[in-house]
C-alpha cells in the first residue's frame, strides 16, 4: 500500500506536500518523491529513500512550484531503492501509482518494442511510458489516461502531470482509493481524507473507472467516453486537530496516550446504563439483527486480531456462532453461507484492499446483511456496506494501531 497526495494551487506548495505525505506515512515509508511543474512548465522531480523527512533537504529544487504530485511508497515490485521510487517519468509525463498492475510484464515487452527504455524494476513505470505513448498519438491527455487505464489489469490509483499541460493533474482509480478535495484557489487529490482536511473539509470520493482533471480553480470528473460526471460534494466531519500532534512528541506517543479518552468517549456514545444503545449500526438495524444466528468476520492484520477477540466474546455470551478469516484468504476461497449469517468487515481506514475485495465478493453471496466496522466515514468500505459502525477514534497516522485495536 502506498500514499498519493497532489495539489494544484495558485501559491507555492512544497511544504504542504511534505506535510501531506507525512499524514500518509502509515501507508508506506520506505521511500518518497515529488514531481511538479517549474516556472517554465518543465517537470522537476525529487526523490529519497527512507522516511519522508529525507526529502526536506531537497525542497529547494521545488521552489515556487504550484502544481505537483507526491508519493510515499511501500515496496511491492522492486526493492526500496532510489531508481524504484515514485514519481516515474517518461518524456512529458510524470506519474505516481498505488496498486498492483498484474499485466505489467506484457505491457513492458510491448513498450520496449516501441523503443521505451525502463530505468526501474517496478510495475508502475509501465504506466508513465504507456501514457506518454498514447499522448504522442493523440496530443490529448484525457484520451491518454483513458487509453492507459483501459490497458491495465489489476488495481490502481494514478495521479499524473504533463509538462505540455501545466498547472493540471489527471487522475483515475480502480480498486484503490482516490479522494478529491475542493479548496479556495487550490484543489487536492489524496489516497485518503486525512491530508485534505488540513486545507478543506469539502471532498468528492472517486469511484472505480472514473477520471478527473484538476487545476487550482476546477475539478472535472469524466467517464471513459469523456462525458462529464456530476457528483455531490461531501463535507468531512474530521477535526483537523485530530490529525495534529497537539503537543505530543510524535504520533505514536499521541495515539498511546489518547486511548483512554477515546474508549471513554465510545462507551458514552454507544452504551446505555444496562445495555448497548439500539440502532448503533444505523436506522432500524436492531430489527435487522434480531434473527442473526451466525457472524462471519473478515479482516487483515490488527483488525483480524480484533475479530478473534470478538468471536470469543460473542460465542461466550450469546448463542451466535462466529468465524473469523483473513481477508487475503477469504477472497480466494469457496464460501458456503449459512442462512441468517451477517458478514462483518473490519478495517481502520476502510481502504484495506483485501478487505474491500472480500466485501465485494460477499455482496454477491447470500448473506443476510453486511456490516463494516471502520474509523473513516468517507471510506470505500463504508460506502459499500449495508450497515456501518463508525468508531470515530481519530485518524491513525502512526502505523502501530494501539488505539484502533482497542476501539475495534
Which residues does each predicted region cover?
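Phosphate/diphosphate-binding loops
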Residues: 201-202, 206-214, 343, 347-382, ...
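Conserved short alpha-helical segments that host acidic/polar catalytic motifs at enzyme active sites
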Residues: 1-245, 249, 264-291
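Conserved small/polar residues in nucleotide/adenosyl-binding loops
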Residues: 403-408
Amino acid at each position: 500500500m502506498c500514499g498519493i497526495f497532489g495539489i494544484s494551487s495558485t501559491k507555492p506548495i512544497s511544504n504542504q506536500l511534505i506535510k501531506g505525505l507525512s499524514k500518509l506515512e502509515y501507508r508506506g515509508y520506505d521511500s518518497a518523491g515529488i514531481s511538479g511543474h517549474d516556472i517554465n512548465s518543465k517537470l522537476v522531480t525529487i526523490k529519497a529513500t527512507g522516511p519522508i523527512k529525507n526529502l526536506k533537504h531537497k525542497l529547494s529544487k521545488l521552489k515556487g512550484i504550484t502544481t505537483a504530485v507526491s508519493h510515499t511508497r511501500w515496496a511491492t515490485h522492486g526493492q526500496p531503492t532510489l531508481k524504484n521510487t515514485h514519481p516515474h517519468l517518461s518524456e512529458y509525463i510524470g506519474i505516481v501509482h498505488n496498486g498492483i498492475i498484474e499485466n505489467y510484464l506484457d505491457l513492458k515487452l510491448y513498450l520496449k518494442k516501441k523503443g521505451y527504455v525502463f530505468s526501474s524494476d517496478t510495475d508502475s513505470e509501465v504506466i508513465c511510458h504507456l501514457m506518454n505513448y498514447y499522448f504522442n498519438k493523440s496530443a490529448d491527455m484525457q484520451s491518454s489516461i483513458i487509453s492507459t487505464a483501459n490497458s491495465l489489469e489489476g488495481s490502481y490509483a494514478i495521479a499524473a502531470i504533463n509538462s505540455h499541460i501545466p498547472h493540471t493533474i489527471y487522475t483515475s482509480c480502480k480498486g484503490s482509493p482516490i479522494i478529491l478535495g475542493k479548496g479556495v484557489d487550490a484543489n487536492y487529490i489524496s489516497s485518503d481524507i486525512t491530508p485534505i482536511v488540513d486545507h478543506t473539509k469539502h471532498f468528492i470520493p472517486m469511484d472505480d473507472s472514473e477520471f478527473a482533471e484538476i487545476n487550482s480553480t476546477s475539478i472535472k470528473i469524466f467517464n471513459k467516453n469523456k462525458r462529464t460526471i456530476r457528483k455531490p460534494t461531501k463535507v468531512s466531519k474530521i477535526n483537523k486537530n485530530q490529525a495534529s500532534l497537539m503537543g505530543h512528541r510524535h504520533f505514536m506517543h499521541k495515539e498511546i496516550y489518547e486511548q483512554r479518552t477515546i474508549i471513554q468517549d465510545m462507551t458514552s456514545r454507544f452504551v446505555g446504563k444496562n445495555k448497548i444503545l439500539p440502532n448503533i449500526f444505523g436506522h432500524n438495524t436492531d430489527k435487522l439483527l434480531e434473527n442473526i444466528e451466525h457472524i462471519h468476520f473478515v479482516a487483515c492484520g490488527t483488525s483480524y486480531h480484533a475479530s478473534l477477540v470478538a468471536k470469543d466474546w460473542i460465542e461466550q455470551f450469546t448463542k451466535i456462532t462466529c468465524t473469523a478469516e483473513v481477508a487475503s484468504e477469504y477472497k480466494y476461497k469457496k464460501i458456503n453461507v449459512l442462512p441468517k449469517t451477517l458478514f462483518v468487515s473490519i478495517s481502520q481506514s476502510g481502504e484495506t484492499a483485501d478487505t474491500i475485495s472480500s466485501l465485494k465478493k460477499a455482496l454477491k453471496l447470500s448473506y443476510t446483511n453486511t456490516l463494516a466496522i471502520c474509523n473513516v466515514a468517507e471510506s470505500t468500505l463504508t460506502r459499500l456496506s449495508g450497515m456501518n459502525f463508525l468508531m470515530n477514534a481519530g485518524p491513525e497516522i502512526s502505523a502501530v494501531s494501539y488505539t484502533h485495536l482497542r476501539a475495534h
